[in-house]
Amino acid sequence: MSLSNKLSVKDLDVSGKRVFIRVDFNVPLDGKTITNNQRIVAALPTIKYVLENKPKAVILASHLGRPNGEKVDKFSLAPVASELEKLLGKKVNFLDDCVGDNVEKAVNGGSDGEVFLLENLRFHIEEEGSQKKDGEKVKASGEDVKKFRQQLTNLADVYVNDAFGTAHRAHSSMVGLELPQKAAGFLMAKELEYFAKALENPVRPFLAILGGAKVSDKIQLIDNLLDKVDLLIVGGGMSFTFKKVLDNMPIGDSLFDEAGAKNVENLVAKAKKNNVKIVLPVDFITADKFDKDAKTSTATEDEGIPDNWMGLDAGPKSNELFAKTVAEAKTIVWNGPPGVFEFDNFAKGTKSLLDAAVKSAESGNTVIIGGGDTATVAKKYGVVDKLSHVSTGGGASLELLEGKELPGVVAISDKK
């Protein structure tokens, strides 16, 4: 799967055509009120670009929440239609389903770039391919899925995918439209461009920064990255498992991952073989309980963490060491914070690392933040625009970094 050779919306001739855009309008709702419209705003450049190029109609499709394959009013995309109308300054026709005769009739009657927003794709079991019933997974029949995909295909002449956050799912709207041209929207294209920069052709030294709790969740990630990077910072809860296994450091009540511990020595041996320098924290900010108001103390790697205490952040010496490592790198991918940044007393390590990452990006290096918690950190401190790229897809970016193919990306046409 090449990331750098995919058809882009800019390569399409959309004039007079029905353009189906798979967007990510999975926004947080309080009742019928959208509490954060960022995902809608993020899709505007692709929608506006298509509209400027004189299509017959633009058909927007998304999921919202987890309705589990049936119609659930609180997951309706109706509130999104009125928000989108405001943001676009153009009428948006909201349709109360995403497939079927009425939908086809409406869309085919569209002209002069009329905009249609389909109802939540996941109101149909065929979108995800299964639903949970009484705790059991029930699959949609192959026939029904095929029919649903054909009905979606009937709505369009060309297909654009701008939903990177769902790219790791082989859902019908991501992989099932059989059209001659399937292109990446601007959001998707930017994600692919930056991940290609890191994974296919990095400027070296290439550094990966990994945090998060469990080693066992990240084994495939570490294993894949050890074939690509020159430097690896392991921080967060995961670092205690490394410190205990490698240095026999006492870790008190800090996180210890029994399952992951079995792999630490293999991973370190692979790093040695591949000449990858692994950087671990050397001191810690500790707490007497997992709580924002916990008593705090410090510990060095030599003394270790006493019983009944736990490490919740990297200490000042580790922060210096991490900043120095960041300063050596020309390409950086960061997935997972080095401390419990949600609690102010344990956010210094994360803030310090973020400052170093911003400094690196400002001096012209490529700094990519994987989605999830690390993206939340970048937003919290208001530095999203100061970094090269903050991914919109936690799960999708993780799977890319693990070396997996993303079905939604594979489905996009390659440039001829």
Curated annotation (Swiss-Prot):
ATP binds at residues 213, 218, 237, 311, 342, 373-374. Keywords: ATP-binding, Cytoplasm, Glycolysis, Kinase, Magnesium, Metal-binding, Mitochondrion, Nucleotide-binding, Transferase. One of its GO terms (cellular component) is cytosol. AMP binds at residues 213-214, 218, 237, 311, 342. SUPFAM superfamilies: Phosphoglycerate kinase (SSF53748). (2R)-3-phosphoglycerate binds at residues 23-26, 38-39, 62-63, 65-66, 121-122, 168-169. One of its GO terms (biological process) is glycolytic process. It is found in: Cytoplasm; Mitochondrion. CDP binds at residues 212, 217, 236, 336, 341. The keyword Membrane does not apply. Mg(2+) binds at residues 213, 217, 373. Its EC number is 2.7.2.3. InterPro entries: Phosphoglycerate_kinase (IPR001576), Phosphoglycerate_kinase_CS (IPR015911), Phosphoglycerate_kinase_N (IPR015824), Phosphoglycerate_kinase_sf (IPR036043). Pathway: Carbohydrate degradation; glycolysis; pyruvate from D-glyceraldehyde 3-phosphate: step 2/5. It catalyses: (2R)-3-phosphoglycerate + ATP = (2R)-3-phospho-glyceroyl phosphate + ADP. Its main location: cytoplasm. ADP binds at residues 212, 236, 341. GO terms for molecular function: ADP binding; ATP binding; metal ion binding; phosphoglycerate kinase activity. It comes from the Eukaryota. Its cofactor is Mg(2+). Monomer. Belongs to the phosphoglycerate kinase family. Catalyzes one of the two ATP producing reactions in the glycolytic pathway via the reversible conversion of 1,3-diphosphoglycerate to 3-phosphoglycerate. Both L- and D- forms of purine and pyrimidine nucleotides can be used as substrates, but the activity is much lower on pyrimidines. Negatively regulates the biosynthesis of acetyl-CoA from pyruvate in the mitochondrion. This is Phosphoglycerate kinase. It comes from Debaryomyces hansenii (strain ATCC 36239 / CBS 767 / BCRC 21394 / JCM 1990 / NBRC 0083 / IGC 2968).
